[in-house]
Design a protein with these regions (language model features):
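Ribosome-associated RNA-binding proteins
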Residues: 1-167
């Protein structure tokens, strides 16, 4: 890892990430441990201290292990297939929905489960959010695109609510 001012370059087995951390932070590397502290006399710039630490931590984790988000498709005919580096999803619309893969993001497709993988946590999360936004889970049956660990609160519906007929 190299640091020059607020510009950080992290290299690892998965690749290289370059990021500019918020101003007003000083990054030091001592004995292989990176520390982020607010610059002396920075005033209100110390509000970005936690953000800078998290960004640096995510860069290190990304270049060493990577990030992944698992998405599940539930619904009749809902599926996904790869079209080059991009993802084509059939979600019950007239035309398929295309999701562009950001640089460094890859897809692994198994039946109704798509795993979004990459070095940059922000890019992986952005692509996963785009997938979910294309057809969010609906509250009655739960069909749609959801995160694997997401719990969908289902509504009762007319029959379960005890609707009485007009008599």
């Amino acid at each position: 890892m190299t640091v020059s001012g607020s510009h950080v370059v992290a290299k690892g087995p998965k690749g290289e990430l370059i990021k500019d951390l918020p101003a007003g932070l000083t990054i030091t590397i001592v004995d292989g441990v990176a520390k982020v502290v607010p610059t002396e006399g920075a005033g209100t710039e110390s509000v970005n201290w936690g953000l800078g630490r998290s960004l640096l931590s995510n860069m290190i984790t990304g270049v060493s292990e990577g990030f992944k988000t698992v998405m599940e498709f539930s619904g009749v005919g809902y599926k996904a297939q790869a079209k080059g580096p991009d993802l084509e999803m059939n979600l019950g619309f007239t035309n398929p929905v295309m999701i562009k893969a950001l640089p460094g993001v890859t897809f692994q497709i198994e039946k109704s489960v798509v795993t979004v993988m990459g070095m940059d946590k922000e890019s992986v999360g952005h692509v996963a959010a785009q997938m979910r936004a294309a057809r969010p889970p609906e509250p009655y049956k739960g069909s749609g695109v959801k995160y694997q660990d997401e719990i969908i609160r289902k509504k009762a519906g007319k029959k379960a609510a005890g609707a009485t007929g007009a008599a």
